[in-house]
A protein has these predicted regions:
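Bacterial N-terminal signal peptides that target proteins for export
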Residues: 1-9, 249
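Bacterial Sec-dependent N-terminal signal peptides
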Residues: 2, 14-39
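Terminal, contiguous helix-loop blocks that mediate binding/assembly
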Residues: 30, 168-421
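Loop/turn elements at helix/coil->beta-strand transitions in domains of secreted/extracellular proteins
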Residues: 33-36, 72-78, 134-140, 217-222, ...
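Solvent-exposed loop/turn segments at secondary-structure junctions
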Residues: 43-47, 84-88, 114-115, 145-151, ...
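Functional beta-strand-loop-alpha-helix junction segments that form "active/interaction loops"
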Residues: 47, 87-88, 95-133
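N-terminal carbohydrate-binding/catalytic regions of secreted carbohydrate-active enzymes
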Residues: 52-68, 72-86
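Surface-exposed loop and adjacent secondary-structure segments within mature catalytic domains
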Residues: 83-106, 143-196
Length: 421
């Protein structure tokens, strides 16, 4: 028996040695592409207006500056999908030329079939193209465009006009805020609603994005939404099977977007610094002439647990009629408000000690990093902007208490509502 066991151990050892020395050359672990970052910048305008196009181009320039500051990309690759107009888009790679100390843009593929990405199949085909061009151990995604949280564009009837502030009077400064952009007809917005399924070909539903990522067979390490109002429980819950982390703002985002050069080292690392991304972005704006920004990093893998506790709370508690809605921290400028701070809302429900402790602990586990300036701003209704003081910011908003007709019509269709009621 001992002889048989000894012989078996020798065979196993030989087999393992064979696996580790089957080639003449040793496997170079450092040569593996560890992360591919897809920067997704779909068309944000209409057939005859460019909207955020110049801002998005400036964002790519800022990324290039970050790459130069880091003297390259090391074990990472960056592919950018950018729409030039409503029909044409390019997929190109940012490459660092070490000899010239510059970042070059290598075009990989040109698209002339419009907004093919507005379906799950189209989104999956784009991600699969990225995988084919730059296979990696991990994938992450930055999405730069307009946004209006989880809401469905089909539920809007009369849109508010969006007036952009004129900061300095130049045309470049005039397009300063990355919120909702509307044309002369308030029933036909030219902005991008993540949540739209029927407004026009340039709209993408959050569920469509999530399904497209899942169809590609990967799960993102993180998704950074450089867009307004995407930091909400409804969106985070919808993306829980598509990404590990969601980085997003619960309020309006300036059209100049995230300070990519400043936060680049935190973004491109194989172990991203979520606290670095959040603090770097908020501190950048806090020191600027327009000190309005909040941002949070959400662990979407914790969303099921958060929903489970929220369901227990909703089963026993409702918002008392004596509590005014304006006492719950607003994070947006819609009238009536759509986006309320999640932590303050739950406090307003006044759950029992046990449930409150459970919720607080789970919220802390879900929100890995969150930071806000003292105020955020909204330019939806007011040409010169209106400031919203932020006394409390948990890192996520919720639309459960909203009396806005869009929220009332749409929230029960969300996965979050179904999981918590």
């Amino acid at each position: 028996m001992m002889k048989k066991l000894f012989t078996l151990l020798i065979c196993i050892s030989s087999l393992l040695l064979g696996f580790t020395s089957c080639g003449d050359e040793a496997f170079d672990v450092d040569s593996v592409n560890r992360q591919t970052l897809l920067v997704f910048m779909p068309w944000s305008g209409s057939s005859n207006t460019a909207s955020l196009y110049e801002n998005l181009r400036a964002n790519v320039d800022s990324m290039c500056a970050g790459i130069k500051a880091q003297k390259g990309l090391k074990n990472a690759r960056v592919l950018v999908f950018m729409s030039r107009n409503s029909q044409e888009s390019n997929l190109f790679e940012l490459k660092y030329d070490d000899s010239k100390k510059v970042v070059v843009r290598d075009t990989l593929k040109k698209y002339t079939d419009g907004a093919f990405y507005n379906s799950a199949e189209g989104m999956a085909s784009l991600i699969n193209e990225v995988k084919q061009q730059a296979e990696a151990l991990n994938y992450a995604m930055i999405i730069g465009c307009h946004g209006c949280g989880w809401t469905y564009a089909a539920d809007w009837v009369n849109y508010p006009y969006h007036a952009r502030p004129n900061l300095g009077g130049t045309s470049s400064n005039y397009d300063y805020w990355g919120s909702i952009q509307f044309g002369d007809d308030p029933d036909h917005p030219k902005s991008r609603f993540f949540g739209s399924v029927s407004l026009d070909d340039a709209k993408i539903d959050i569920a469509t994005l999530a399904e497209g990522i899942k169809q590609s067979g990967i799960k993102m390490q993180y998704i950074l939404f450089d867009a307004c109002y995407m930091g909400n429980v409804e969106t985070a819950y919808e993306l829980k099977d598509a990404t590990n982390f969601l980085i997003a703002s619960s309020s309006e985002v300036m059209s100049i977007g995230m300070p990519y050069k400043t936060i680049w080292s935190s973004l491109i690392s194989t172990a991203p610094s979520y606290s670095g991304i959040v603090s770097g972005s908020v501190n950048f704006y806090a020191k600027s002439d327009a000190p309005y920004c909040n941002l949070a990093a959400i662990d979407c893998r914790q969303m099921d647990k958060l929903a489970s506790i929220m369901k227990e709370i909703n089963a026993s508690y409702t918002l008392h009629s004596s509590i005014p809605l304006d006492s719950i921290q607003p994070l947006g400028g819609f009238r009536p408000n759509i986006f309320y701070d999640l932590g303050v809302y739950v406090d307003s429900l006044k759950p029992s000690g046990y449930l409150k402790e459970q919720f607080t602990a789970q919220l802390k586990a879900t929100v890995k990093a969150a930071q806000s300036t003292e105020k955020v701003a909204s330019y939806i209704f007011v040409n010169q902007g209106e400031e919203i003081r932020v006394k409390s910011y948990s890192g996520l908003s919720i639309s459960d208490p909203s009396q806005n007709s869009v929220a009332i019509k749409g929230r029960e269709k969300t996965g979050w509502w179904k999981a918590t009621h």
